[in-house]
Amino acid sequence: MRLLFILISICFSAFRAQADNKKLYQQLDSVIAHRADYHALKDKELQNVKLSATYVTDAEEKLRLYEQLVNGYSPYIYDSAMVYVQKGTHLAQQSHLSAYYNRFQMLKARLYVFRGFYIEAKQCLEQLNIPPSDTHQNYLYNCAQSALYFSLNVYCENSEFSEHYKKLFNEYITKALYYYSKQDAQYYRLKGVQLYLSDGPLKDISACLNKAMSLTKPNNPLYGMSAFVLSKAYRKHKQYELQERYLLLAAMSDVMSSS
């Protein structure tokens, strides 16, 4: 579904571009032609994780696999992802593993955000008690909050509420970045998004998002998400040839990651 929106965007932007990016269009055609292969590979990976989760007896290892399945399915296969959120929540409660319980509640909030259930996501996050000393939990919590307010900002764009949600997004994304490794692709993607929303310099946005892309592979959703935000940044600055280029890269990544 996201690929459709990207391709529509390409159609509307292509006539303004100064170059045709022919090689990228040819690559996209080839990637789309093999879409079923990418989907089959992703499905095989998920089936292998499911099989492992069936036979694992250690609670923490099973929870780790459930978390992997949620991340593998979300955000575009909501029902399947939510099944493993519920399984993980139940097992974490049974096993008295509060850290995993919190993590699955944050995953649930993230899924709610993707579906537009903003009140439910907010309520889910408000009931959590995150230990200040747990770096990973604090990172996940602030990421979930920033995703909520990012989506609310987009939803309320050009309204009197937009700036309020943008401010809250910036507060939470700053905290998330504080807790995350600067050697990771996710760090540079988040930093690039923050700079984009705060109207930072284009060269800094480009540096962060290209760094994120260089630290991952085209079949990773992070690659496509980074490329998509960068295309929006170039559009904002009326650099339509580069906008087109990064839309094409985002579209290819979308297919290759089978999201």
Regions found by a protein language model. Give the residues of each.
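Short, Lys/Arg-enriched, disordered terminal segments
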Residues: 1-4, 17-19
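Sec-dependent N-terminal signal peptides
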Residues: 3-12
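A "functional boundary" signal
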Residues: 15-259
